[in-house]
Amino acid sequence: MSTLKDMSIQEFDYWHQDRHVNPQHLESVAAFHRAGIKDAAGHGGGLGVEIEHLPVRTADNPVSAPEGTAVTYAEEHGIRSVLEDLRGLYDPAEEVYEGDFLLGLGKEGIRISLEPGGQIECSFSVVHSAGGLERLYADFLQNIGSALRRHGVQLVTQGYQPHSLSEDIDVIPRKRYRCMDAYFGRMSGFGRNMMRASASVQISIDYFSEEDAVAKMRTGTALGPVLAYFFRNSPYFEGQASPYRLLRQHFWTRIGNSRAGVTPGLFDGNFGFEQAAYNVLASPLMVADVTQTPEYAQESDPVRIAAFDNAADVYPDRALNDYEISHIISTHFNDVRLKNFIELRHWDSLPIGRTVQLLRCVAHVFYDREAFTEASSYVSGIREVDVEECKLGLQVYGDAALPYGRPLDFWRRLLGLDRDGTYRGR
C-alpha cells in the first residue's frame, strides 16, 4: 500500500477529471504555444502593454451630467461619438464593427478597443524600452484629446469607477460581452463589477523555450500579488472608499476557479504547454464563438452562452484555427495567461508615469538573467496554496503582511522599488 509520503501528488490530475478534450484541439493549442517561442540569440525580449481607461464626465460637459460619472457607449456624447470623431486619424482598414456599431480603431503602433462597460483600452505595439511606450502613449493622447474635450469626457487611470455604480453602466453592443455579463451575473460574485466598472494595466513578455515559459509563469504568478500591492490603485468601489486593499484580486478570487487565479497545475513538476492547453480546452467555454468556424457558416446565433459546453462540444473534430484558439484562451483570466506570449494581469489601471515604473521593473526582473534567477530563487518550491496565502495575507494585513515569510521591504529591495513605487534598479 502506498503511503502519503510515497505519493507524488500532481495538482493538475484533480482538475478537469472527465478529460473531455479533443486530441486535435489539444495539439492545436499546444502548437500555438510552441509557435510563441522566440530565438534568444540577439533578442532582448519585447514588452507588450495594454492600458485601460475609465471614461467619466468632465465638470463642463454638454449633457450636464455630474462631474466624474461614468460615460457609456451609446449615450449622447458618449464613447461611440468619441470613436467616430477619431476615425479620420486611424487606418480605415483596422476599424472594428459589430453590426453597425464602431467598437475599435487601429493604426501603426496603436490599437483602441472597448471593454464591456465602454472602458477605452489602448494596446501598443511591442516596445523594448520605457521610452518607446511613452512615445506611443503621447501619440494616443494627442489624437484623442480634442474628441474627449468636445464630448465632455476625461480618461481616469484607476482600478474602478470613482463615483458610478456598476449596475448603472450599460454593456456595449458586443454579443460576447453581453453573454459574459449574463453568465457572470448568475455564476459568479463581482463579475459584473469587473466587467462594467474596472480597469487594468497588462504587460506581456516573451519566452525562449517551454521551460522558460513555465519558469516565467511560475515566478510571475508568485510575485504578482506583491507587485499588485505595491502598485495598487483602486481607492473607490461603488461610489465609496474601497474596503479592499487589493480590489482587483478580490474580484478574480470570486469569479471562478480554473478560469481565474492561479493556473491549475502550474506548480506541478511536469507542467508544460500540454497541461496549459488542457486547462483552456477542458473548462466550459462560458461563451461559444463560431463566427470564424466554416462548418457553422450558416449558424444564426454564432455567439452564445456555453455554461457547460467546452471546446470539444462546440468545435469540429479537426485542428483549430487561430481565431478559435484565441477565443478559447480569451475565456480564461488567470493571473498569468499563456498565449503565444505571457500576459501578466495583476494590476489596476495606472497613470502613464506609474505604468513606466512598473514596466521597467518587469523588464529587469524577467529579462535580466541574473535578476530573474535571484527573484525565482526566493519563490522556488512554493505551491498554489502558498500563493493563495500570500494574496490573503496582503488583503488582510496590508503593510504588515509577510509574503512567503518575508517583510515587504525585502521584496521592495529585491524588485528595485522605492516605497513610492519608483523603480530604482538594483
Regions found by a protein language model. Give the residues of each.
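Short helix/loop capping segments that flank catalytic or ligand/cofactor-binding pockets
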Residues: 63-64, 130-132, 213-215, 228, ...
